[in-house]
Design a protein with these regions (language model features):
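Lipid interaction determinants
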Residues: 17-76, 82-129
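Sec-dependent N-terminal signal peptides
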Residues: 4-16
Length: 129
């Protein structure tokens, strides 16, 4: 009986962990930022600042990622999904690269919440256009 309970519990945990993975297809498109919060030190952009800067993140089917800010491309590179992590490789001027992850906290059909993985993390809420 104990063995059956163990296998049932183990199976439930495995299935639950698999359902947390996010498919890149769910991200494709343009996501306009509606809130940007920095947690240490506490700070956030006002609604007026967001309207003026019009920040967005764009995911394409060829695994390219672009971040726009102020009507211009702020950052670009490639990404791959790893569970709930967006593994972003940013292409820098001069041919360099920088890798960093974003953690997806929430994802719906039109809503996305993600954050950086630094100690002084930033959380972004976005709406799909």
């Amino acid at each position: 009986m104990k063995i059956n309970i163990f296998f049932i519990s183990f199976s439930v945990l495995v299935l639950a962990s698999c359902s947390n993975a996010i498919d890149a297809d769910e991200l494709y498109g343009r996501w306009d930022y509606i809130a940007v919060e920095n947690f240490n030190p506490p700070d956030s952009l006002t609604k007026e600042e967001l309207i003026a800067q019009a920040p967005a993140i764009l995911f394409s089917k060829d695994n390219k990622l672009v971040i726009e800010w102020g009507g211009k491309q702020l950052s670009h590179g490639t990404y791959k999904m790893d569970g709930k992590m967006i593994r972003y490789t940013e292409f820098l001027e001069g041919g360099g690269k920088r890798e960093f992850p974003f953690l997806i906290k929430e994802l719906g059909e039109k809503d996305l919440v993600f954050q950086t993985m630094e100690q002084n993390y930033t959380r972004v809420k976005a709406k799909k256009r």
